[in-house]
């Protein structure tokens, strides 16, 4: 240890001096020749905010472990160790050395954008997530040396040689901190997750199914059930397929929901993907009914033979409480509309679950550990598990799901492949669905689908070289939520396919679309002050008059008038106008809370960034102060009546999950213990003997209300504005997306698409510069991973 310290002292420097980076004033090769010089360089990058302290500590750990075993690591190995840790913090599962060496600056996003603000926006926060970035002028450019400068001195082959020679690196057969698989370098934990998921998928895809033989009794029952559940449809328009333009005629009679049910029914692992309103929930409910029909018919035959059998045990889950509540709301109605009496197998309502839980609750989370109660040694009691909003599930959680599933259990993933990937490392759904637009169904699959569904599969979906995974992935291609002329639909498709053109942008500026308006689209570079004034006014009113036809005259799918777009005055007025008091019942207060929570969800501001004038922190403060000036809230800081809050961390003691939204009320202090424990903050009028309580909807979808004292809430923030990431799993009648005045690495096509598709009926856009919208659409989220390669048979170990 003393020897190491002496060596360190030889390279001691003052971070405040111009000699901040050794290699900036000397030969860059020094950092790749001496371990201590390399670690000094990492320290400098960390001090500048380019990488995290965790990344530096990991490199130091590799050094220490290697020294303990008597062989000092090459500085290049330490550099790569720090960079793979950095990339995991940015959501990547690994570092592909070939990609890294081809363009290190772009791969690493190091250095960040050259301007101070953009550079700060690219810096991951100290908690380790790169998804919510901010402008911070205190972080500076650490001289001239960059990771790309160091990596330019070596080749991919030299990296491989150094890594293969390092004691801390292995191909996975030994326990080492780093795993090298081909040219992909992993932290061991994430390599194990990837392998576990791939093994779980492949094992399920290989399991024989009684449905595979189209002449079997089970297949006949499935076909009969699907014919009951799906009536013939008219022409369906393809959505989001790269090949659709060449194949529209061949799709005229294809019911993609029916095809998805058939494909998913015959495989122990299946994925159903589709954009908003394509009927993922409806499809999976019909799928479960069809599976129970097959199970019921089999049960009847077994009972006739004196054998025992059972229906499937089915569980429904979602990544967040908010997503679970949404699925709860929609699935109950979908189940109630099923023609169960007409199905074979005596399917009853009780056979189709309607209760949705979070993945954390399903797996049995435990405090202070990422390990769950259910695992390989204590698997779930389940035959079929359905996970909605699967795009939000990171690699770690997906591995935990596979660990907790019995080998015979069927896993069905639902989600939109084009939405933002999970906050933490991985893009599991996106990687599984890479080939979904073009199907790649084998001739045997095509023949089976024809036999079961009586459907001719379009030629563009057929591929004699299709992979096993392709046969278990189905894509829904028609949106039932948005009308043909919907601006939300048109804009989302243009963003998703990168086909934005001047005409589409002009229609948004002119409010030609009936449901979309770009509020400041005519101003190429509006001032910050004018944009903030626009945001504040929009937050209050929703700018109904800015929409086509003043936001009036639109009808929903049932021919009923749609309510016009609103702002936050809508829910705050509802709170101010009620006449409840200490004589009112808890039930009456609950009903008011339900109405207010529903009114609050009618409008939501979404941001790409967390900090800075364009981020949620700055805008929440700005909007609160404006609402206070408009006398819609009593104060703009602390706890107050009307304050909306977003839970930012799971609290299992309170039953609150990350993403849950509540509204603060002033309620009578004598309402009883069900309102919450603890004195908490007093209300804004001390003389009324009232207390502040936060109303949250229960996560079981029942519509009940839970009242929590503010003093018991630990991880939360005000939520007049939320990040697009936090909005996943939610939808709002009117969504306003606010984009900054310049492009940053987090402003991507996936983020913009996700923001647009959170809008159910109305979408408004405010930008700090008109160019950022198109420029952001041109940037894609590409996360390094090896899952697809492993599933395609790329086994290098």
Predicted feature locations:
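Accessory, non-ATPase domains that flank or precede helicase/AAA+ motor cores in DNA-metabolism machines
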Residues: 2-224, 230, 234, 240, ...
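Conserved, well-folded catalytic cores of nucleic-acid-processing
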Residues: 65-68, 103, 107, 166-169, ...
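Residue-level signature of catalytic and energy-coupling elements of molecular machines
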Residues: 100, 197, 320, 388, ...
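Conserved pre-motif I regulatory segment
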Residues: 224-236, 251-269
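ASCE P-loop NTPase helicase motor core
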Residues: 259-261, 265-513
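Residue-level recognition of short, solvent-exposed, well-ordered loop/turn junctions
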Residues: 406, 638-641, 657, 727
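Conserved helicase motor core of P-loop NTPases
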Residues: 418, 422-645, 651-653
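C-terminal accessory regions
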Residues: 497, 610, 660-667, 674-797
């Amino acid at each position: 240890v003393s020897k190491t310290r002496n060596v360190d002292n030889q390279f001691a420097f003052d971070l405040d001096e111009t000699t901040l980076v050794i290699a900036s004033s000397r030969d860059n090769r020094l950092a790749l020749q001496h371990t201590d010089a390399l670690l000094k360089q990492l320290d400098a990058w960390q001090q500048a905010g380019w990488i995290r302290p965790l990344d530096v500590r990991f490199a130091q750990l590799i050094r220490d472990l290697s020294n303990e075993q008597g062989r000092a690591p090459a500085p290049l190995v330490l550099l790569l160790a720090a960079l793979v840790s950095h990339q995991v913090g940015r959501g990547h599962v690994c570092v592909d050395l070939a990609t890294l060496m081809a363009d290190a600056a772009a791969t690493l996003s190091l250095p960040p954008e050259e301007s101070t603000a953009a550079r700060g926006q690219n810096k991951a926060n100290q908690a380790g997530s790169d998804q919510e970035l901010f402008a911070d002028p205190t972080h500076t450019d650490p001289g001239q040396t960059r990771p790309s400068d160091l990596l330019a001195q070596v080749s991919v082959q030299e990296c491989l040689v150094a890594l293969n020679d390092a004691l801390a690196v292995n191909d996975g057969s030994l326990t080492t901190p780093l795993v090298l698989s081909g040219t992909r370098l992993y932290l061991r934990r994430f390599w194990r997750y990837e392998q576990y998921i791939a093994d779980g998928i492949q094992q399920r895809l290989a399991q024989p199914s009684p449905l595979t033989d189209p002449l079997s009794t089970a297949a006949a029952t499935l076909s009969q059930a699907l014919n009951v559940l799906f009536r013939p449809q008219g022409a369906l328009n393809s959505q989001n397929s790269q090949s659709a333009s060449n194949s529209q005629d061949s799709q005229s009679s294809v019911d993609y929901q029916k095809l998805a049910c058939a494909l998913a029914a015959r495989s122990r692992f299946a994925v159903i993907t589709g954009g908003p309103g394509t009927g993922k929930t409806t499809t999976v409910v019909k799928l479960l009914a069809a599976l129970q029909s097959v199970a019921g018919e089999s049960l009847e035959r077994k009972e006739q033979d004196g054998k025992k059998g059972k229906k499937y045990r089915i569980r429904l889950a979602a990544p967040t409480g908010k997503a679970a509540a949404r699925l709860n709301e929609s699935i109950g109605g979908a189940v109630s509309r099923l023609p169960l009496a007409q199905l074979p197998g005596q399917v009853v309502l009780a056979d189709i679950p309607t209760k949705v839980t979070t993945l954390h609750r399903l797996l049995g989370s435990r405090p202070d550990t990422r390990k769950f109660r259910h695992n390989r040694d204590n698997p779930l009691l389940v035959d079929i598990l359905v996970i909605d909003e699967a795009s939000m599930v990171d690699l770690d959680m997906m591995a935990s799901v596979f660990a907790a599933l019995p080998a015979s259990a069927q896993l069905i993933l639902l989600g939109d492949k084009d939405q933002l990937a999970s906050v933490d490392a991985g893009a599991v759904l996106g990687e599984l669905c890479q080939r979904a637009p073009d199907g790649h169904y084998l001739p045997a699959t095509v023949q089976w689908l024809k036999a079961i569904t009586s459907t001719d599969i379009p030629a563009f979906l057929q591929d004699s070289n299709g992979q096993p995974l392709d046969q278990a992935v189905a894509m829904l291609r028609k949106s039932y939520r948005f009308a043909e002329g919907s601006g939300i639909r048109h804009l989302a498709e243009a963003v998703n396919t990168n086909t934005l053109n001047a005409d589409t942008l002009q229609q948004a500026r002119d409010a030609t679309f009936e449901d979309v308006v770009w509020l400041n689209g005519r101003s190429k570079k509006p001032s910050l002050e004018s944009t903030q004034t626009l945001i504040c006014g929009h937050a209050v009113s929703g700018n109904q008059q800015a929409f086509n036809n003043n936001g009036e005259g639109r009808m929903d799918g049932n021919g009923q008038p749609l309510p016009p777009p609103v702002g936050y005055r809508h829910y705050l007025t509802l709170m101010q106008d009620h006449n409840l008091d200490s004589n009112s019942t808890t039930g009456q207060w609950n009903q008011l809370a339900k109405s207010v929570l529903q009114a609050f969800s009618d409008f939501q501001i979404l941001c790409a960034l967390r900090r800075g004038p364009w981020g949620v922190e700055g805008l929440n403060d700005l909007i609160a102060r404006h609402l206070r000036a408009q006398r819609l809230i009593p104060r703009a800081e602390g706890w107050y009546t009307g304050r909306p809050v977003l839970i930012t961390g799971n609290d299992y003691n309170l039953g609150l999950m990350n993403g849950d939204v509540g509204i603060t009320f002033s309620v009578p202090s004598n309402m009883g213990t069900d309102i919450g424990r603890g004195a908490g903050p007093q209300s804004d009028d001390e003389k009324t003997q009232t207390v502040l309580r936060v109303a949250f909807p229960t996560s079981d979808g029942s519509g009940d209300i839970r009242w929590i004292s503010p003093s018991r809430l630990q991880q939360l923030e005000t939520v007049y504005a939320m990040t697009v990431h936090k909005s996943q799993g939610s939808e709002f009648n009117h969504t306003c997306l606010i984009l900054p005045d310049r492009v940053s690495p987090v402003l991507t096509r996936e983020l913009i698409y996700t923001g647009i598709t959170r809008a159910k009926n109305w979408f408004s856009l405010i930008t700090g510069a008109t160019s950022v919208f198109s420029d952001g659409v041109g940037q894609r989220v590409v996360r390094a991973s090896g899952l697809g390669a492993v599933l395609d048979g790329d086994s290098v170990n």
